[in-house]
């Protein structure tokens, strides 16, 4: 185009790189056409909105922002609602008031409610496998977390902890036992013992510590662990650090798990406030047997040794139910003579309460035992090993009391200045402080001297329950958990393990001696009677104690608690025989009331089952005992051990297994010479030679004579 064309419209000049374009450099060409050359970087100017359009545009933008805000708010609100209703961690569903756990099939197997407050789920956050919350629904601060742990493919575990930030509060969670098809086991030896657990009435949470069940109907027994197991393959273990209290409510079928430091013998660890924590681990597996095996291997110690073989093979003979405190030298020698005259073997002969001048002495009462050394020599010549009864008390009239006070060997009152005196079943005295190294050495030193002087084989360690300590006390080493005192007492038996027996157990599974059930009454029922024997043995077995002594055949024969005989003192004849038959299949059996106090038939029945024990039962017991140091599996097992999915097996409390191959079904009711017997799946051969291979099967009214126990061996 010609450069002299006239420009009638404004054109934008082209700036050359490096040039400075000012107003004077602008050149306008004359207009010659309707086209104009535009610069390379030209962009048309945006027309400015008129003043009338601006309010409309602002309104539109504002409306759009409001719509977006509403959408975002609704999404946030919906998410918040979903969050407030439930949080999930693998198979666990957490809500404000508790949580539930499902198994791999989606079935609910565990449910728990928070009873000391609800969670504010808006305060919860997740960090990997850890889900933590910092606030309760009422706004108070707390520390709560659930951590998911998968220790193996078939097991899922959840670590749960609720800790109050302020001292003085109690933390309580309610664990529901579920519907009638769910069954729970474990916990503690009880006065009225059922298998599975049966809740009765309502019980406010009380300290879960070792106790003498004779002191209270609702007391927990001398052997207990913070462990429960469900037939639906769920298990719970409460942590050792918890100031643990347990109650129950039978109406809602719940167990009340509580942690508190007020109105209790629990004390916070040194340097910590009295703000309690409730912490535990819940694990879910594929079946009840496998999850129990996992929990035992994870949380319980195992015995490192096995007691003497004669304790599994031959009966123990005790002076207690026969002679009580009236025992003396002549009675001991006569008892030993009668045992041999009636051709019975013996694991050992036990001289029980009371052979000393006072409780707390460690020498024989010369009035009752004028020549104890000669008595021991004669017993030894007759082939008897001898054990002695001992306990942790030193009565105020004992020759040892002054020494114990001077050397500060006793549990003391809270200020620590004076020994704490307690009342026990044999008077008033002090209690040895087994947290004190000097007290431990003093006690064991006396036992060693007794063993050396008289060739005593071992000892029966009686008592040891926390219920015999004052509620407020102090020890050489402070105890935040009072049951640790019981554990320290059981440790006194370890040097004498081969034939020793103790009656308390708390975290004591590594003590390689027999754990004795609390004394039984000479009655038929579940209240410390014959029917309670199998449930108690199964419970203690599930708590990790395989070497169990079910106390004396026929019970203690205390007159006011005895189903009496018409022809003399002691338990009635039928009860005695049925008790003897059960005991013959237990890890240990113990006589005190002897069979010859009845008649020749009872003596013959006793001989029959002593021989059966030696030939059939004892070899199996010893084989299983040898495996325990590796596996931790119980010797006496419930039927569901080999049939974990069998709902009938879950609730049977009158049969048991020895290992996996010997099933025992004794008669436990008066006047019966038949019983129903349940055989789980498999091939079973009866003691009569019958083969049962169409199983599982219920044998109704299976005949069992007075001199028989129905037992079956695995034939597959």
UniProtKB/Swiss-Prot annotation:
It is a single-pass type II membrane protein. InterPro entries: Alpha-glycosidase_related, Glyco_hydro_31_C, Glyco_hydro_31_TIM, Glyco_hydro_b, Glycoside_hydrolase_SF. It comes from the Eukaryota. Residues 1-11 have a biased composition (Polar residues). The active site is at 462, 465, 527 (proton donor). GO terms for biological process: carbohydrate metabolic process; positive regulation of insulin-like growth factor receptor signaling pathway; positive regulation of phosphatidylinositol 3-kinase/protein kinase B signal transduction; skeletal muscle fiber development. Residues 77-716 are extracellular. Induction: Up-regulated during C2C12 myogenic differentiation. It is found in: Nucleus membrane; Endoplasmic reticulum membrane. Glycans are attached at residues 239, 249, 455. Disruption phenotype: Knockout mice develop bilateral calcifications in the thalamus, due to the formation of calcium phosphate deposits. GO terms for molecular function: hydrolase activity, hydrolyzing O-glycosyl compounds. It is an enzyme of class 3 (hydrolase). The keyword Hydrolase applies. Its main location: nucleus. Expressed in brain, liver, spleen, skeletal muscle, heart, lung and kidney. High expression is observed in the cerebellum, specifically in astrocytes. Highly expressed in skeletal muscle (at protein level). Pfam families: Glyco_hydro_31_2nd, Glyco_hydro_31_3rd. Gene3D superfamilies: Glycosidases, Golgi alpha-mannosidase II. Residues 1-55 are cytoplasmic. The chain crosses the membrane at residues 56-76. Interacts with IGF2; this interaction is required for IGF2 secretion. Putative glycosidase. Promotes myogenesis by activating AKT signaling through the maturation and secretion of IGF2. The requirement of the predicted catalytic residue Asp-462 to support myogenic function strongly suggests that MYORG is an enzymatically active glycosidase in vivo, even if concrete experimental proof for enzymatic activity is still missing. Belongs to the glycosyl hydrolase 31 family. This is Myogenesis-regulating glycosidase. It comes from Mus musculus (Mouse). The lineage of its organism: Eukaryota, Metazoa, Chordata, Craniata, Vertebrata. The gene is Myorg.
């Amino acid at each position: 185009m010609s450069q002299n064309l006239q420009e009638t419209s404004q054109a934008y000049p082209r700036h050359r790189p490096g040039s400075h374009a000012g107003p004077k450099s602008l050149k306008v060409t004359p207009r010659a056409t309707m086209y104009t050359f535009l610069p390379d970087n030209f962009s048309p100017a945006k027309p400015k909105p008129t003043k009338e359009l601006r309010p409309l545009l602002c309104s539109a933008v504002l409306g759009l922002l409001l719509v977006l805000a509403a959408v975002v708010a609704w999404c946030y609100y919906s998410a918040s609602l979903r969050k407030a209703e439930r949080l999930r961690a693998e198979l666990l569903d957490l809500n404000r008031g508790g949580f539930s756990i499902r198994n791999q099939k989606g079935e609910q197997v565990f449910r728990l409610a928070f009873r000391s407050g609800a969670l504010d789920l808006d305060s919860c956050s997740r960090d990997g496998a850890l889900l933590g919350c910092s606030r309760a629904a009422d706004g108070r601060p707390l520390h709560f977390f659930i951590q998911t742990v998968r220790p193996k493919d078939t097991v899922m575990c959840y670590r749960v902890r609720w800790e109050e930030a302020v001292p003085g509060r109690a933390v309580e969670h309610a664990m529901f036992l579920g519907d009638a098809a769910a069954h729970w086991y474990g916990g503690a030896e009880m006065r009225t013992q059922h298998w599975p657990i049966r809740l009765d009435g309502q019980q406010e949470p009380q300290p879960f510590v070792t106790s003498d069940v004779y002191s209270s109907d609702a007391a927990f027994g001398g052997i207990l662990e913070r462990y429960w197991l469900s037939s639906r393959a769920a298990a719970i273990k409460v942590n050792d650090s918890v100031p643990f209290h347990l109650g129950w409510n039978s109406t809602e079928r719940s167990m009340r798990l509580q942690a508190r430091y007020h109105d209790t013998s629990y004390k916070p660890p040194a340097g910590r406030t009295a703000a309690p924590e409730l912490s535990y681990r819940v694990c879910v597996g594929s079946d009840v047997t496998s999850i129990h095996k996992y929990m035992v291997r994870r949380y319980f110690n195992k015995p490192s040794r096995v007691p003497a073989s004669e304790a599994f093979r031959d009966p123990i003979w005790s002076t207690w139910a026969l002679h009580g405190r009236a025992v003396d030298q002549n009675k001991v020698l006569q008892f030993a003579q009668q045992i041999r005259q009636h051709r019975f073997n013996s694991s050992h002969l036990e001289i029980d309460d009371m052979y000393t001048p006072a409780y707390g002495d460690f020498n024989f009462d010369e009035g009752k035992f004028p020549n104890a050394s000669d008595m021991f020599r004669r017993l030894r010549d007759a082939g008897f090993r001898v054990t002695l009864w001992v306990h942790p008390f030193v009565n105020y009239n004992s020759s040892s009391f002054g020494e114990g006070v001077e050397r500060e060997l006793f549990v003391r009152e809270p200020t620590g200045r004076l020994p704490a005196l307690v009342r026990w079943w044999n008077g008033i005295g002090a209690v040895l402080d087994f947290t004190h190294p000097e007290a431990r050495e003093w006690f064991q030193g006396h036992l060693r001297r007794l063993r050396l002087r008289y060739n005593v084989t071992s000892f029966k360690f009686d008592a040891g329950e926390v219920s015999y300590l004052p509620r407020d006390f102090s020890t050489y080493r402070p105890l935040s958990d009072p049951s640790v005192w019981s554990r320290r007492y059981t440790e006194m038996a370890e040097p004498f393990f081969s034939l020793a027996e103790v009656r308390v157990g708390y975290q004591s599974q590594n003590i390689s001696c027999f754990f004795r059930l609390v004394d039984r009454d000479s009655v038929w029922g579940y209240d410390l009677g014959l029917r309670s024997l199998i449930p108690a043995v199964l419970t203690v077995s599930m708590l990790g104690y395989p070497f169990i002594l079910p106390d004396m055949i026929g019970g203690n024969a205390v007159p006011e608690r005895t189903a009496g005989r018409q022809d003399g003192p002691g338990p009635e004849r039928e009860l005695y025989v049925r008790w003897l038959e059960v005991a013959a299949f237990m890890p240990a059996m113990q006589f005190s009331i002897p069979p010859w106090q009845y008649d020749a038939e009872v003596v013959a029945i006793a001989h029959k089952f002593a021989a059966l024990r030696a030939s059939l039962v004892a070899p199996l017991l010893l084989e299983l005992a040898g495996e325990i140091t590796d596996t931790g599996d119980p010797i006496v097992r419930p039927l569901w051990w080999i049939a974990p999915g069998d709902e009938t097996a879950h609730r049977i409390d009158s049969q048991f297994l020895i290992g996996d191959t010997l099933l025992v079904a004794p008669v436990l009711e008066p006047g019966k010479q038949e019983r129903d017997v349940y055989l789980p799946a498999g091939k079973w051969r009866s003691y009569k030679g019958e083969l049962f291979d169409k199983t599982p099967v219920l044998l109704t009214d299976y005949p069992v004579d007075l001199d028989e126990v129905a037992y079956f061996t695995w034939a597959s």
